Amino acid sequence: KTGKRNAITDVPGVLVGHCTVNTEENHTGVTVIIPGPDNAFANHYTAAAYVHNGFGKSAGLVQVEELGTLETPIALTNTLNVGRVWDALAGIVIEQCQNDGLEPMSINPVVGECNDCRINQIQKRAVGEKEVRQAFAAATEEFEEGDVGAGTGTICYGMKGGIGSASRVICIGEKEYTIGVLVQSNFGATEDFILNGEAVGPKILEWKQEKNDMAASEEDKGSIMSILATDLPLTSRQLK
């Protein structure tokens, strides 16, 4: 069965926040996933990472793989904003740690990305510290999905992509656990689109061709960031 919200925030303690940038030149943003109610650096949440396609510019995955822990919230943005978002995330975590009496000398911010250059002037690097802080301030259990935050500039199956989320509740013995997922979708050719088990892509492609829509011939390329969260008692190797 699905969780109460059918979202990653059905996992206890997880929050999601967005900041969306929509201007004449830029259609982009940032999404933050806060893994729990406590200081992530102090708690070092059990974590793992998996790279399906290595043509990406994500930050922080190497240490997650090495140590099996997550010590910051996760941020998603566009490709050329990874550095600026990393810097903002580091600053926010340092502030949180100092407020909790900690003085970190090394921090591993985790930032994922998709390239949204098709509808966003990505070279402008429109996401900075202000936008990251706004995303943190907006973090909640009841977050928006679709054309928001890091999904503002993404394209999926030749149509508008965005942020999506879902959850499932499973039973092991007499105890219930929740698995939640959040995606930033930016991939796929229209002809391969399947909705609720039905291959609707070819029909959409035919309609686009009738309308002389040039986007109908897009190649199957792009990327997707997938963030999974769970309250299952697993090790980093089991998560992998």
Would you name each region that the model predicts?
Residues K1-K240:
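A structural signal for small-residue-enriched, beta-sheet-centric alpha/beta enzyme cores
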